[in-house]
Amino acid sequence: MLHRVKLLTGLQELSDAQLFLYFLATSMSKVFIDGEAGTTGLQIRERLALMPAVQVVSIDPVKRKDPEAKRELMAGVDMVILCLHDDHARESVAMIDSLTGQKPKIIDASTAHRVEPGWVYGFPELAAGQRDAVVNAERVANPGCYATGAIALLRPLIDAGLVPADFPVALPSVSGYSGGGRTMIEDFEAGKAPLFEAYALGLEHKHIPEIMAYTGLTRRPLFVPSVGNFRQGMLVQLPIHLDMLPGKPKAMDLHHALAKHYGQSPDGWVSVQPATDNGKLDATALNDTNKLEIRVFANETHRHAVLMARLDNLGKGASGAAVQNLQLMLGV
């Protein structure tokens, strides 16, 4: 009681400007970015710096590897965003699990929890109810960049019955080199990397499990990623022989199904756009945004179509998606 009286007396002595700053500070959501020095962490921090309702809390660099200091910091924030390798992300989650009392909400940008029970997949546009699931979630797994594009293309078509769950899907894709981590970034920026390079040609990639889990595919897709000599930007492609689909739909049927699905999204980050007149698509046009655009290119004479998802691999494919999920989870 005495503490409350002293607090009220102190507040009465503050100017209007000081009162505003006091109440702003006490109402701000505190966020700790575990791994803020990496590419995704830095971008998240930059985006959060523009949000007056969020305060980013950082650990003393000297204590960065001190588990007790980290545990104490985590206990005092509203949310922890994990921008770590998978094993370290699991360690941080275990540390949060060990806390007593109110635990912070978690967004994990690693691959570690994307198909794990108890985690909500952080693509609010996935299906009806997914946005509300993110709003009410304690733990959200941020999607992978390629997976975001692939799921955005496939899930509405599978739900609509236009593409069978066992359809043989191919997903040739290209990303800017920032998606490859620090070593790839350094190689490209030092001129040590080729202008264009296909990779993961052993046909194993960490995004395939989440692509299957959240599209509903029962047949493993043929995913062929590549990297170009540009820092950021992404195209995920879905080529289709239309006559191989049940009922032999027209390309416009695919367009309409996608437009119907994403037209119901209240946030407007994912949209279906007309095919470009020149038959070209720039992978970098959505850089530094949280947007994802879908287009259906087609040649009905040959009954061919290629569906394209364009996004910033560091935006809707990483940090932009994390901030979108944070806003939904914290209501800021």
Ranges and model annotations:
Residues 2-5:
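Extreme N-terminal basic, low-complexity initiation segments
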Residues 13-27:
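Short, Lys/Arg-enriched N-terminal segments with co-localized hydrophobic residues
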Residues 39-71, 83, 168-173, 177-307:
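C-terminal substrate-binding/catalytic lobe of Rossmann-fold NAD(P)-dependent oxidoreductases
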Residues 140, 254-255, 322:
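PAPS/PAP-binding and catalytic site of the sulfotransferase fold
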